[in-house]
Amino acid sequence: MQTLVFFLIAALGEIFGCYTFWVWLRLGKSILWIVPGVLALIVFAFALTKVNASNAGRVYAAYGGVYILSSVVWLWLAEGVKPDKWDLLGVTICLLGTVVILFSHYR
């Protein structure tokens, strides 16, 4: 359960942090948008270090599925775009990979 909490914190930090750069560079908003974005990216990196695992690459691989799910939720809630069946199928496939990695290495 603790792993999932840190993955969700990391996902929110990463998505929000990267989105602030999108807002600045793609939507033409103020560069000041990146100030909270950089802080969010620091939270993202810190959260992944709190996952109980000895290999960074394995943590990142398992986190990938949670990140993808969180990105699709962000697409829907923050950007107002409803995910289609292909988005949901992709998320499902990725989460299956996350489960395989988590249950085979984090027991």
Curated annotation (Swiss-Prot):
The chain crosses the membrane at residues 4-24, 31-51, 61-81, 86-106. The keyword Cell inner membrane applies. Keywords: Cell inner membrane, Cell membrane, Membrane, Plasmid, Transmembrane, Transmembrane helix. Belongs to the UPF0060 family. It holds the Pfam family UPF0060. SUPFAM superfamilies: Multidrug resistance efflux transporter EmrE. It is a multi-pass membrane protein. The keyword Transmembrane helix applies. It comes from the Bacteria. GO terms for cellular component: plasma membrane. This is UPF0060 membrane protein Ava_B0196. It is found in: Cell inner membrane.
